[in-house]
Amino acid sequence: MLDSIKQKKNSKRIKMRIKTGDLVKVINGKEKGKTGEVLKTIPLENRVVVKGINLRTKHVKPTQEGESGRILTEEASLHASNVMFFSKDKNIVSKIEFFIDKEGVKKRKLKKTGELID
């Protein structure tokens, strides 16, 4: 247990092009073709949590007397390589590239169309 925690702390942070709040489309796996908003990114594991996708049920035991158990449904993480940025305006998926504009600000744009994201 302790070794796995140390390993995660010592592992390199992976640079992710997808950010929290982006609209993504699942391109691989059992949820293929579905779209959703990114709720959370986990850079150390290169994973993302997408709203309404990859749902898992969790059975929770009662913690106090008189309380009944519950069944919770929550989103599990997906590997970042299984999702792509989805443009709602153009209705396409595309890779993301970074560039620096004339003012020296780092921005993101779609590789297919050149549409600015940030």
UniProtKB/Swiss-Prot annotation:
GO biological process terms, semicolon-separated: translation
The organism's place on the tree of life at top rank: Bacteria
GO MF terms, alphabetically ordered: rRNA binding; structural constituent of ribosome
CDD domains: KOW_RPL26 (cd06089)
Keyword Ligase recorded: no
PANTHER family xrefs: MITOCHONDRIAL RIBOSOMAL PROTEIN L24
Family from the record: Belongs to the universal ribosomal protein uL24 family.
Protein function: One of two assembly initiator proteins, it binds directly to the 5'-end of the 23S rRNA, where it nucleates assembly of the 50S subunit. One of the proteins that surrounds the polypeptide exit tunnel on the outside of the subunit.
Protein name: Large ribosomal subunit protein uL24
